[in-house]
A protein has these predicted regions:
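Walker A/P-loop NTP-binding motif
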Residues: 102-119, 137, 251-254
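Pre-Walker A (Motif I) flank of P-loop NTPase domains
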Residues: 86-92, 118-120, 199-200, 260
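Conserved Walker A/P-loop ATP-binding site and its immediately adjacent core
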Residues: 119-143, 155-161
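SF2 helicase catalytic motif II
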Residues: 220-258
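Inter-Walker segment of RecA-like/P-loop motor cores
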Residues: 145-213
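N-terminal accessory nucleic-acid engagement/regulatory domains that precede
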Residues: 1-65
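Walker A/P-loop
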Residues: 87-109, 240-241
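Conserved pre-motif I regulatory segment
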Residues: 57-94
Length: 260
C-alpha cells in the first residue's frame, strides 16, 4: 500500500498529467473526473499480463509453441511439480548446463503465475553480461504472452544504454502504446526511472535490483510493490557470496510474506 501511495503521489504531482489550474477552479467536483481521465490517457500504461492460455496449465504442444522444442525430462518434471502445486513457495532447480533450466523456469513461471494470479515476472542474474545474453530469449517468450495486448518489459541494470536490443525496443515504443505498431512489447517512459524499474510486468536484470528491496532506503516500497505481484526467478544463485546471501535471505522473507 505504501508503494502504491508513492506511485500515485508521483503521478498526481506531475503537471504533465495534471496541469495546474486556477484557484477559482478548486472545489468543483465536476472537473476532477475529466482531469483524471485526461491523465489516464496521457499515461497510457501497458496492459496487465494474464498468464496461462489453458486451464490445465501447459502441455507439450504449448511448450513447443513457446520455446521451439518439445520438453525434455527436466522440463516435464518442473511443469508437473508446478501444476500439482497449490500454494506459492520456493522451488530449487539444479541440473547440469544445457538441459534447459531457463525454459523450465519460464514454463513454471507461467503455470505458477496462473495459479497465483501473478501479474509479471522478475528474472535476476548475477552480471550485466548474463542479463544481456538472456534478454532476447525472454523477449521471445514475452512476445507470445502479448499477442493481443501491449505489455511492458524492462532490462534493469546500469548499462542498458549499451544494449542494442533494448535500445531498439525503446525506439519502437516511441509511438503511443495504443497505436497499431507491430511490436507488442513496449518500454514505457514512466517506468524508466531506477526506483520504478520493478513495476513493469516483465523485468530481467542484475540480482542487485532484487537485493536492494532488502535495504532501508527511500522509496524502497516501490520495489516491494513491483515484486509483490510477480513470479521471481533467481539464476546462478550458487555464485553469490555470503554478503549477498544476507540480503537474499531477508528479501526471501519478504517474498514469502507476500505469497510470491
Amino acid at each position: 500500500l505504501t508503494g502504491l501511495l508513492i506511485m500515485a503521489d508521483w503521478i498526481a504531482s506531475n503537471t504533465y498529467y495534471f496541469p495546474l489550474i486556477k484557484t477559482d477552479c478548486l472545489g468543483k467536483d465536476t472537473d476532477y473526473p475529466k482531469r483524471v481521465n485526461n491523465a489516464i490517457e496521457r499515461l497510457n500504461f501497458p496492459e496487465f499480463w494474464i498468464p496461462g492460455e489453458n486451464d490445465w496449465g501447459m502441455d507439450d504442444a504449448l511448450f513447443e509453441e513457446r520455446f521451439g522444442f518439445l520438453p525434455r525430462e527436466v522440463q516435464h518434471t518442473a511443469m508437473e511439480i508446478a501444476q500439482n502445486t497449490i500454494e506459492p513457495g520456493i522451488f530449487i532447480l539444479e541440473a547440469q548446463m544445457g538441459v534447459g533450466k531457463t525454459e523450465a523456469a519460464l514454463a513454471m513461471a507461467e503455470i505458477l503465475g496462473q495459479k497465483a494470479g501473478s501479474g509479471g515476472i522478475f528474472f535476476g542474474l548475477p552480471t550485466q553480461a548474463t542479463a544481456n545474453g538472456l534478454f532476447p530469449r525472454l523477449m521471445k517468450w514475452a512476445e507470445q504472452q502479448s499477442e493481443n495486448v501491449k505489455l511492458g518489459i524492462r532490462l534493469a541494470h546500469g548499462a542498458v544504454a549499451l544494449n542494442e536490443d533494448y535500445q531498439q525496443l525503446i525506439k519502437g515504443s516511441a509511438l503511443s502504446v495504443g497505436e497499431d505498431e507491430e511490436n507488442n512489447l513496449v518500454v514505457h517512459s514512466w517506468f524508466e526511472g531506477r526506483k520504478v524499474a520493478l513495476l513493469v510486468d516483465f523485468v530481467i536484470g542484475t540480482i542487485d535490483q532484487l537485493l536492494m528491496a532488502a535495504l532501508n532506503q527511500r522509496h524502497v516500497m516501490l520495489r516491494h510493490l513491483g515484486l509483490a505481484g510477480k513470479v521471481v526467478i533467481i539464476d546462478e544463485v550458487h555464485s553469490y557470496d555470503s554478503y549477498m546471501m544476507t540480503f537474499l535471505e531477508r528479501i526471501l522473507n519478504w517474498l514469502g510474506a507476500y505469497h510470491v
